[in-house]
Amino acid sequence: MDLHPPGGSKKTSVVVVTLDTGEVYVIASLLSKADTQVIYIDPTTGILRYNGKPGLDNFKSEREALDYITNGSRGGVRSSVYARAILGYAVLGSFGMLLVATRLNPSIPDLPGGGCVYTVAESQWVKIPLYNPQPQGKGETKNIQELTELDIDGKHYFCDTRDITRPFPSRMPLQSPDDEFVWNRWLSVPFKNIGLPEHCVILLQGFAEYRPFGSSGQLEGIVALMARRSRLHPGTRYLARGINSCSGTGNEVECEQLVWIPKRNGQSIAFNSYIWRRGTIPIWWGAELKMTAAEAEIYVADRDPYKGSTEYYQRLSKRYDTRNLDAPVGENQKKKAFVPIVCVNLLRSGEGKSECILVQHFEESMNFIKSSGKLPYTRVHLINYDWHASVKLKGEQQTIEGLWMYLKSPTMAIGISEGDYLPSRQRLKDCRGEVICIDDIEGAFCLRSHQNGVIRFNCADSLDRTNAASFFGGLQVFVEQCRRLGISLDTDLGYGHNSVNNQGGYNAPLPPGWEKRADAVTGKSYYIDHNTKTTTWSHPCPDKPWKRLDMRFEEFKRSTILSPVSELADLFLQQGDIHATLYTGSKAMHSQILNIFSEESGAFKQFSAAQKNMKITLQRRYKNAMVDSSRQKQLEMFLGMRLFKHLPSIPVQPLHVLSRPSGFFLKPVPNMSESSNDGSSLLSIKRKDITWLCPQAADIVELFIYLSEPCHVCQLLLTISHGADDLTCPSTVDVRTGRHIEDLKLVVEGASIPRCANGTNLLVPLPGPISSEDMAVTGAGARLHEKDTSSLSLLYDFEELEGQLDFLTRVVAVTFYPAGAVRIPMTLGQIEVLGISLPWKGMFTCERTGGRLAELARKPDEDGSPFSSCSDLNPFAATTSLQAETVSTPVQQKDPFPSNLLDLLTGEDSSSDPFPQPVVECIASGGNDMLDFLDEAVVEYRGSDTVPDGSVPQNKRPKDSGAHLYLNCLKSLAGPNMAKKLEFVEAMKLEIERLRLNISAAERDRALLSIGIDPATINPNSSYDELYIGRLCKIANALAVMGQASLEDKIIASIGLEKLENNVIDFWNITRIGEGCDGGMCQVRAEVNKSPVGSSTKSSRGESGSVFLCFQCMKKACKFCCAGKGALLLSKSYSRDTANGGGSLADVSATSIGSDHYICKKCCSSIVLEALIVDYVRVMVSLRRSGRVDNAGREALNEVFGSNITNHLAVRGQPSPNREDFNFLRQILGKEESLSEFPFASFLHKVETATDSAPFFSLLTPLNLASSNAYWKAPPSADSVEAAIVLNTLSDVSSVILLVSPCGYSDADAPTVQIWASSDINKEARTLMGKWDVQSFIRSSPELSGSEKSGRAPRHIKFAFKNPVRCRIIWITLRLPRLGSSSSVSLDKNINLLSLDENPFAPIPRRASFGATIENDPCIHAKHILVTGNTVRDKTLQSVESMSVRNWLDRAPRLNRFLIPLETERPMENDLVLELYLQPASPLAAGFRLDAFSAIKPRVTHSPSSDVVDIWDPTSVIMEDRHVSPAILYIQVSVLQEQYKMVTIAEYRLPEARDGTKLYFDFPKQIQAQRVSFKLLGDVAAFTDEPAEAVDLSSRASPFAAGLSLANRIKLYYYADPYEVGKWTSLSSV
């Protein structure tokens, strides 16, 4: 196997290796790195794994890495893909998709200062099938296939050493690109998550190429053209025109023309560059394509056609504003007062032309921008130049001359950038200008002048005319660039070359007596006047700058050497074809004008060009009509946009498989074959096809799995494996989880394992352990599966059971039960435990992967509620510090302490009012809204630093205070006697208050039952009939998608801009209980106060405050009478006129929400307002879930680091581990490894710990994280402690090292140490390694006693074994010496165990034996435990099946399953109930076959909250909602028996399987019945169908997913001997 295919020197190399086991490794050897990294792609979930451990996934060479992967044998390699670069990776459902570049073209080989720009010549998608059976729709599979068909080759480029997303030379390093031009940002995230961001290149779309030019065979200069396409408005010709909600324009390209003179190594390089833009007109417009030969009809938006135009020019102004960068002294440039942006509009402006409307609006947009006052230092100027009309009337040459005339003034004013690259930074003292030094280059850049401003060209599509005009504009600049570099293009001078001078002057012929020479050091030219015997750097006769702008076409042609012009024209021709192909699917038209300077422009060529243009026109029309929508989808998916629409079930972050080695079984798994191993092959992916045969006498099989890392367990993945008879598979499974083996809790009981084909993957969702009390009070145990489907929670889960979340789970016990009473051996297949592991590596180092976890660690745990970031406990309160732009009045502040304020400390009323309003008044400025994502340009996570004084931490709040406040809310709505039935909106607002108070559903039900109220009576899901609820749910779902799209657009729009101002009205604007309109200036009066008896009016922060103008009815409305911004989105698709009729949502991609647009509640239909409140409640439910995740994450950190977490965490930007700790570790380890570091190692059992001690996990945390004064100690009452340490992996252990506590040891607390080793939890099988008395170490090493001296290496005691022992568990027993056992107890009075003031765990001294004044008992203590040795490479024993076992598995089944014919089947209740009617003489039914469902679980179920900082960054989300509360389905089977009564005979908890998988469920016993009923129960509402392209918001279809329909999905069967039933019956096997 040749690692390096023929044809290459040492360069970046990537090899994608697929082994016969199905495992995929990516071996990457970067040019910038001396070593090789191996990235493992998990074959189950597709997640990337990399630890950076030498010898495991970091090697010296590519060959060494491959030898390790293949065990030195190439026979196990299934396939290999050789590549030159990694372009991206994504896990898309059942596939991992790796994009690599297999062939590169060095399009710009050597930029000034180094760096090669590569164009992707050939690319390949490596499609990796995954074992995870996540349900995936057919549409998703189709979209994934379309993604792989995206045209990448020849149209994308990158540089792996320099930032080229900004004008040359960039001031930023490679890994800080400009996001506007990065096209694979989403695809690069997985590599950033594993700490290898540089392994995925930064990919740009567009064109990059260079041309050398010279004369007489000599190289004079190099011109390079780079065109960067913006991703702010990606898409195809008729789907991405004009401006969008991201303030980006369609087909927007930044072009850069770079010219330099190549020099020898060590010499400075002079260069200059010119930037221009091209793109469609930045207003809201489009074109409707007719299916005829006529032109498309152009239209401009009726409302706000210039919205976003100002932001577009702001982005340009910010990028090209270089007024303050030019050197203030010694340069020719004057100080610039403003930034010019010149728009050259090439559209047809003649009367009657279709493009005339665009010209008019373009001119009007200029007036709009100037009147806005938002660009005070920018001058936007429009030049209208009808290109086609000029060519038709005047011809091509005069058209070019006219363009030059218009461009002369702006081109000269904007100028170009000039500078030098200095190979040595020692020469910077001679630099006169801006100095750019970055780590990516060795030398430095010195820029003498900067281009200030930009010229922007456009036509209708920014294609053909734009390319031609930009060429002729760029040509004039190119000539001037050459002049300033000393390259003469004048024909009368020949093709001479004169060196650059400091003044940038052009070089003409030298006068008599003058001579030019080159400086030997810098390479610069200087001039000698032999007449006066003087020298100068400046040319004695500088030429006139920009002189060709005044020339006529023929004069230009005669006076200019045309070969460089031809080279430049060739670059523009290629560029034009690339951009035209990306935008229209065809090459550029009307390109023949670019060859006007050549001699081949005759009549025949003009005729050929006309034929070519006609052909391209027909190609464009076909592709735009038939292919554009597919290409648009491809681009969006490639960019990671609208994934909730195209790939709705794809998770943000795949789960980890934590059971795989180094996970292992704590007990050997019993097996019928004596030659088999201990069961480790059941956890190894290398034996995916294993069939494990358990002993025949086993009633149950119980497996104890120790996970490779602590995690929260989410799923159990079982691979069904059996012989010829599938009856050997287990029928049910129980799962228990816990941190230690003694505290396991039941999470799943009796989950069904159906019979299915060999090799089928079944997924069992695992919730956290649920309290039996919570299950009882919510009715989940008694009522969940008995309730009617009509009362299913369609809107949201009203009775959500909250399982415990624990990120330190380490032990999983899986118990399998056989089927039936007949004892036959069970067969097991591979077992995998999937979960979410906290990014410990990112926490322990300075990497970004710590993400949200590091934020939680540094955030004080002030409140368990996720809604504590606003001072009135309202996370959704809109910002009141801003004023409306329409009609507004000053905000009057109310009394911040109203008389009826509730006492949050006691939960009691602070006034005499018996039923006060549960509303805490807040007078605060904005910025505390957790859900104001539509009000900010960049949404940032809000910490709890704004928690007000009135809020109380959850753990300090009286137990019933939240329930008391909740009941007060209920009484304020239903009256003191609870006589009033709550309406839908009231019930929803009550739920909002419940979630604000951070009360769980179980706590709510417990409070309601305490006053005799059935929780079901206030369930909003049953407030309306099912038909209306279904419609409401559909609209809320559409709103969620539009809200997600709006957030996406908001984040993208913030690229290149400052933060935008907030909106006063938020996305929902839900009025709280007791709030309402008090009249005043409000003319709408939609939310009139209906204050119940006994409550005061709470009108708000703005009863006389801001007033807004409704854009529909044009009435003034107060804040309470305005609908949320989400209503604006829905109003465009679901108006009041269509509330009872049509109404569809053809494109759920969000149009922008204007900050100056408002809509009152009277102009919205009631169902739209109700959809807003439904979405609001869903968001709050999600926030509660994320709050629980945060609390669980914080608890895990406390358990590992203790209460003073921030002292233990690595500081961002500082190297970790520090050098001192690293040197100490290397010193005591030598050539051995540390085998017991958390999180890979942990404790098997709990270790007794004192209350003021560091956590016992701190004994194993990485050494560099150990606080200098913190240490672990046992309770004083414990005279011995046993710690069982499970090592990182199977290892050869040679010693145990005990780091001494800062207080040191004395004879009183120096323990005796006993150490055992074993490979499982069987204590009888462990081996004693030795017994040591620490007192003897103290006597021989006195430095072990007394306080630790600062600045010294940590004190330690090494317990060395006589011989290394291979084991997985080390048992350590520490025992205090018995009192009186030693007569030589002499305690140093200066020793104080806890006398260090810095110790966060010991505020007071505690032992007289160490110098304290109070006599206390000694205790066991230690600083850290290190287990040293060498890891044993995982060599899973291959289970060799004996001949008898193989014969047993191959035996044919005695009974087969046969189909029971039916009279009829009747679907009912939205197809969630299916009744099967059997024929009178049917055989006894033994079970049923269920074909797995096709419905999906969407990731987006509500509008996003503001804690989503970056939709591409999974580190901002620790755990998705779908795993916090997993959706579980059940199927209930009932039969009709005597007295015509349906009797339930069985209920099955369904696993997840791929669509269409045949699942066979046996009944508990065979049944004889005329009718069998099947009912689907559980979290039915969590599943949906794939979104359609057009969503009918008012349809009366079933509110449940059609993919869950039981119709034609269930078959009954019976068992029979195939030889007894006959040949014909055998054909009916099921």
From Swiss-Prot:
Recorded E.C. number(s)? 3.1.3.-
What organism is listed for this UniProt entry? Arabidopsis thaliana
Q: What is this protein called?
A: Probable phosphoinositide phosphatase SAC9
Instruction: Supply the SUPFAM superfamilies for this chain.
Output: WW domain
* Membrane-traversing stretches: none
Q: Does the keyword Hydrolase apply?
A: yes
Name the residue ranges of motif: Phosphatase catalytic core: 456-467
Keyword terms: Hydrolase
InterPro entries for this protein: SAC_dom, WW_dom, WW_dom_sf
The record's account of tissue expression is: Ubiquitous. Most abundant in the roots with lower expression levels throughout the leaves and shoot.
WW domain segment(s): 508-542
Which stretches make up the SAC domain? Answer: 147-527
Molecular function GO labels: phosphatase activity
Q: Its function?
A: Probable phosphoinositide phosphatase that could be involved in stress signaling.
Deletion consequences:
Characteristics of a constitutive stress response, including dwarfism, closed stomata, and accumulation of anthocyanin and reactive-oxygen species. Accumulates elevated levels of PtdIns(4,5)P(2) and Ins(1,4,5)P(3) in roots. Hypersensitivity to salt stress. Late flowering, shorter roots with less lateral branching and low fertility. Abnormalities of cell wall and membrane structures in primary root cells.
| Notes on the domains | The phosphatase catalytic core motif (or RXNCXDCLDRTN motif) from the SAC domain is found in metal-independent protein phosphatases and inositol polyphosphate phosphatases.
